[in-house]
């Protein structure tokens, strides 16, 4: 049998397609291979079961290879057989738990070595390959738990607490659950992220012990009459102290569709969010430019090389302007004045400027000495989906 996909260690993203690559991205090539062999051929790489079934029925391939979806939801095959598709927790191809090897310019691996060796875990399923660390155990005493913030961390904590036998009240100040992950899931290539938000919303309704209060902002933590309080209020976007910064569009505002942009768009900040915005703008036919102070794009540890190398290669192949080691001097109505690594200032003509320079924790004011108050997710320390979900388990298991 041939288990076929694409890629080499120089183009690792073909063998482990991130969310930026289309579904079933290897199918055409693998189907071509079958024309030249007389043994079964299996295709892997973001395969969709319905598409794979059609390809198998048509004789194009003999089987579908799946790995990451089993990490996200080990019961997904059973759920498919039982026609419980909406119960399947979708893999979002983030690689944050299963292939946690990150790299940037001049560094072979920027991830902690102990963490790098922990392969085959899952960012969105804390129990996967961590059954001795993360597991559901009924609480010795049922408690009233108040969770402030209905983002991914708050929803995950609510589910774990409910499974352990607690009564949960989840407060969300907006009209919908999802938090900042709604913005993160907005790009066209993030369909699985949007599916994950929908999964969480459905899952919460299955537990009578969880009460969700939308459009309910908690301003005084003392108003929460609970045995334990979990603060999951997320983070706020950073700003940079340069003239004209008020002319910029915050990354979250752009992703939420609050502001339209023109053809030429400069993104200040070459981290993951900034690069994903640039990628989305290019897919829309616009002309993005990235300005980054560091010597490479996406230097934050914990972001898989398969994801970052795809974006770097994509920008290079498609001649997307990327200005590294470049600082912003001023933002004007018609562009951005920057200073390059050679010390020379120049202007980048822009219809709009998007600011994507990270976040700061935004916990609700509270007594830090109160042992019954717990801060999780980005409200505690800005991280990624993996740190948010695993951190929710770390707290919820102790209550």
Model-derived features: where do they sit?
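Rossmann-like dinucleotide-binding cores of NAD(P)H-dependent redox enzymes
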Residues: 167-206, 280-326
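A conserved FAD-binding loop/helix module that cradles the flavin
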Residues: 277, 300-307, 376-399
């Amino acid at each position: 049998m041939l288990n076929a996909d694409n890629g080499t260690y120089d183009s690792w993203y073909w063998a482990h397609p991130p969310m930026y690559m289309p579904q079933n991205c290897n199918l055409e090539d693998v189907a071509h291979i079958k024309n030249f062999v007389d043994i079964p051929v299996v295709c892997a790489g973001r395969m969709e079961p319905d598409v794979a079934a059609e390809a198998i029925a048509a004789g194009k391939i003999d089987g579908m290879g799946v790995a990451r979806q089993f990490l996200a939801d080990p019961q997904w095959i059973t759920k498919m057989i039982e026609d419980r598709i909406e119960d399947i927790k979708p893999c979002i191809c983030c690689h944050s738990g299963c292939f946690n090897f990150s790299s940037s310019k001049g560094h072979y691996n920027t991830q902690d070595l102990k963490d790098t060796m922990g392969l085959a875990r899952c960012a969105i399923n804390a129990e996967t390959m961590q059954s001795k660390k993360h597991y559901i155990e009924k609480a010795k005493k049922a408690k009233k738990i108040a969770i402030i913030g209905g983002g991914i961390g708050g929803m995950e904590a609510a589910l774990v607490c409910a499974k352990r036998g607690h009564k949960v009240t989840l407060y969300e100040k907006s009209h919908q659950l999802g938090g900042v992950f709604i913005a993160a899931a907005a790009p066209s290539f993030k369909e699985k992220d949007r599916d994950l938000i929908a999964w969480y919303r459905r899952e919460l309704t299955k537990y009578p012990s969880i009460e969700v209060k939308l459009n309910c902002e908690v301003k005084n933590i003392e108003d929460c009459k609970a045995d334990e309080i979990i603060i999951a209020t997320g983070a706020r976007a950073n700003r940079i102290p340069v003239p004209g910064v008020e002319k910029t569009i915050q990354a979250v505002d752009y992703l939420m569709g609050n502001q339209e942009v023109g053809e030429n768009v400069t993104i200040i900040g070459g981290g993951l969010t900034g690069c994903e915005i640039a990628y989305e703008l290019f897919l829309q036919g616009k002309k993005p430019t990235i300005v980054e102070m560091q010597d490479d794009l996406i230097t934050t540890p914990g972001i898989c090389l398969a994801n970052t190398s795809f974006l770097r290669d994509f920008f290079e192949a498609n001649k997307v302007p990327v200005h590294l080691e470049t600082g912003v001097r001023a933002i004007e109505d018609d562009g951005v004045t920057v200073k390059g690594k050679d010390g020379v200032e120049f202007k980048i003509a822009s219809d709009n400027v998007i600011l994507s320079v990270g976040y700061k924790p935004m916990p609700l004011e509270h007594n830090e000495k109160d042992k019954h108050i717990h801060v999780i997710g980005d409200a505690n320390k800005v991280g990624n989906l993996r740190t948010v979900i695993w951190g929710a388990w770390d707290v919820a298991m102790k209550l």
